[in-house]
């Protein structure tokens, strides 16, 4: 057969299916922190169902469980460490100059 008349045959590449993120034995519950924390980003945001290949029902259950765990303070709302205070710093009054015009405009009775 001539090379130009030969039908195009696509090579079959083998691919590996991804394992589901939630196994059938896993229970989606707000108390199961080890399972829930896998579906949060580094900032503490809930990852989309497209990222973890959830079904719509699984995504709703995970979202509700994360929100319940946050309300019950089992999980933090954010995972940022910038808000933690390491040491107390003395406050200075030199941060903002006082506006003298405001004081002069007040009427005395």
UniProtKB/Swiss-Prot annotation:
Annotated family: Belongs to the bacterial ribosomal protein bS18 family.
PANTHER family on file: 30S RIBOSOMAL PROTEIN S18, SMALL RIBOSOMAL SUBUNIT PROTEIN BS18M
Keywords: Plastid, Ribonucleoprotein, Ribosomal protein, RNA-binding, rRNA-binding
Species annotation: Cuscuta reflexa
One MF annotation (Gene Ontology) recorded for this entry: structural constituent of ribosome
An annotated GO BP: translation
Compartmental location: Plastid
Gene: rps18
Region: Disordered, residue numbers: 82-109
Any single Gene Ontology cellular-component annotation: mitochondrial small ribosomal subunit
Entries under Gene3D superfamilies matching the protein: Ribosomal protein S18
SUPFAM superfamilies recorded: Ribosomal protein S18 (SSF46911)
Alphabetized Pfam families for the sequence: Ribosomal_S18 (PF01084)
Matches recorded under InterPro entries: Ribosomal_bS18 (IPR001648), Ribosomal_bS18_CS (IPR018275), Ribosomal_bS18_sf (IPR036870)
Protein name stated in the entry: Small ribosomal subunit protein bS18c
Species classification: Eukaryota, Viridiplantae, Streptophyta, Embryophyta, Tracheophyta
Subunit comment: Part of the 30S ribosomal subunit.
């Amino acid at each position: 057969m001539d090379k130009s008349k030969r039908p195009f045959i696509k090579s079959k590449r083998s691919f590996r299916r991804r394992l589901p993120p939630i196994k059938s034995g896993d229970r989606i519950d707000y108390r199961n922190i080890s399972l829930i924390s896998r579906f949060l980003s580094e900032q503490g945001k809930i990852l989309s169902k497209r990222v973890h290949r959830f079904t719509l029902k699984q995504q709703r259950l995970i979202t509700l469980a994360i929100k319940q765990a946050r309300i019950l303070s089992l999980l933090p709302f954010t995972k940022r460490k910038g808000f933690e205070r390491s040491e107390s710093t003395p406050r200075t009054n030199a941060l903002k100059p006082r506006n003298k015009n405001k004081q002069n405009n007040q009427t005395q009775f």
